[in-house]
């Protein structure tokens, strides 16, 4: 999801993602990283003003490797389920606090190192804050139970979990985060199973990072098929749980122009209340919050759709904005951004989220996707 003006870099946003895994089929979730690279999304300081933050770098994130996507053959036309009728505008969830999933690498480290001098800082500033749970492995047989383990945990505490389905075919354009379902028919089935685990409580779904912003690596026909599957996915998720809030990929402020991104989002169903509650941006990146706020509002304006559509922003590592030069791999000098919250105080901004868990390496300060305490401490202190 790292892209510069006219150059899209085939690097995924999911470096160091946490996947809820559980091979026992019983839904026991263990947050575990996928060994993938995430594109750099730059975090922005959260300011009530939509104007760009002066500290934010406009430089797009650099490419780790410009790898041409090797898209799979276009799938044959398929029947798509999911209602297309309009739904009433969403309302604010009854739950007002985000859910902290009890299993993650950072929590494991904190529990295992009570005497480490960095433990208090890492525990209080990272481990104790809610972060998204990623589902990046294509495992149809267990996906329902694993999603249910997270959503039921949130419901039991009266809190809102954040889940990230990340299994679209040809994800990351065949780059470092490649993987996902073998084809769109299989993906549609996987999403049906994912939706079956959402339950009936409040939940935020960050639907397929990179899937829209990075779609220009696909031929036009395959891009249209992907967008049709994403639109269907949004409808299926919201049909399964009317309290689910589904957000679509808007890239980040250093990537596509708002009008271009909005055009693709519209094709993917993001302008319809039947499938969408809005957009997300800055996943795994570092762009300043103020820049993302301004960008997201511009995208929403260009997108049209119901006035209820809003944006959620990944603020996990954007406390100092993006580094000069567009470095994306564990750049020095970055800090934690705004704490996760559903109360931003900003119009059209529904939440600040930690979609990327701070301290999980992009691959330069530790193995890709693994929790690295020295990196976490640098971000948090």
Regions found by a protein language model. Name each.
Residues 1-7:
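N-terminal export and membrane-targeting signals
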Residues 20-119, 176:
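N-terminal low-complexity, Pro/Thr-rich disordered segments
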Residues 91-193, 197, 357, 361, ...:
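N-terminal carbohydrate-binding/catalytic regions of secreted carbohydrate-active enzymes
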Residues 131-138, 177-182, 212-223, 247-254, ...:
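Surface-exposed cleft-lining segments at the edges of enzyme active sites
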Residues 9-19:
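Hydrophobic alpha-helical membrane-insertion segments, chiefly the h-region
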């Amino acid at each position: 999801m790292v892209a510069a003006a006219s150059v899209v870099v085939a690097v995924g946003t999911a470096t160091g993602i946490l996947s809820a895994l559980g091979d026992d089929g019983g839904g026991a979730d263990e947050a575990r990283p996928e060994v993938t690279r995430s594109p750099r999304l730059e975090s922005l300081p959260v300011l009530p003003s939509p104007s760009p933050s002066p500290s934010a770098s406009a430089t797009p994130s650099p490419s780790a490797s410009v790898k041409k996507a090797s898209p799979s053959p276009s799938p044959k036309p398929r029947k798509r389920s999911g209602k297309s009728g309009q739904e009433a505008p969403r309302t604010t969830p009854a739950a007002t606090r985000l859910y902290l999933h009890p299993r993650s690498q950072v929590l494991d480290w904190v529990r295992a190192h009570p005497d480490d001098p960095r433990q208090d800082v890492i525990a209080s500033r990272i481990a104790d804050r809610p972060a998204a749970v990623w589902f990046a492995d294509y495992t149809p047989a267990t996906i329902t139970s694993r999603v249910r383990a997270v959503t039921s945990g949130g419901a039991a505490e009266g809190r809102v979990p954040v889940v990230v389905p990340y299994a679209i075919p040809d994800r990351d354009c065949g780059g470092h985060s490649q993987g996902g379902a073998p084809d769109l028919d299989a993906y549609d089935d996987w999403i049906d199973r994912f939706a079956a685990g959402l339950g009936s409580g409040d939940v935020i779904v960050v639907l397929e990072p990179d899937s829209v912003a990075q779609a220009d690596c696909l031929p036009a026909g395959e891009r249209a098929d992907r967008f049709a599957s994403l639109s269907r996915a949004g409808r299926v998720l919201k049909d399964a749980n009317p309290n689910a809030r589904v957000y679509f990929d808007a890239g980040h402020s250093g990537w596509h122009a708002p009008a271009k991104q909005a055009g693709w989002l519209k094709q993917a169903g993001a302008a319809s209340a039947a499938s969408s509650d809005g957009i997300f941006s800055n996943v795994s990146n570092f762009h300043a919050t103020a820049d993302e706020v301004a960008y997201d509002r511009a995208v929403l304006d260009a997108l049209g759709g119901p006035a209820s559509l809003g944006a959620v922003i990944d603020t996990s590592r954007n406390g100092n904005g993006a580094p000069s030069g567009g470095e994306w791999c564990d750049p020095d000098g970055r800090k934690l951004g705004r704490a996760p919250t559903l109360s931003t105080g900003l119009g059209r901004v529904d939440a600040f989220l930690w979609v990327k868990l701070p301290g999980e390496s992009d691959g330069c300060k530790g193995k890709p996707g693994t929790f690295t305490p020295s990196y976490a401490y640098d971000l948090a202190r």
